[in-house]
Amino acid sequence: MTNRARPAGNHTTSEEEEMQAMKQEVELPELNEGEIYIGRISNTAGELHHVILLPGDNDDATWQAQMNWAKSIGGDLPTRIEHLVLLANHRDQFERNAYWSNEPDTDPGYAGWAWCQTFSGGGQGISHQGSELRARAVRRLIIQ
């Protein structure tokens, strides 16, 4: 069986739809100086959003202090999923230390603990919210 290409403009409806879908580009948000576009990530509700890493690396502080710091610069601490993407694609933007996520541990036996990401070994775990860890902030933009 030979595979012959169709002449340009002679496509079936499903092929045209597929080509149109491939041509669609996601409009990327404008970045401020020092910001790094991380990518599109979905939240637990399945909504897609852009994630942008903000400039600045905050020294060791408690979880609540880091949450407040991130908010003060117009951001939030990364989620656990966002941390995995940051580890995989932007590890060079982090010290080889542990960084707070924005997620407290929801297990009642671990009240007062929150999730963190290490950028040395790459593991995730929980630490007491009174512990002092580093932080980076992200901003999220919902994709309409």
Regions found by a protein language model. Name each.
Residues 2-75, 116, 120-121, 129, ...:
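Extracellular adhesion/carbohydrate-recognition regions
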Residues 80-144:
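C-terminal, surface-exposed recognition/capping segments
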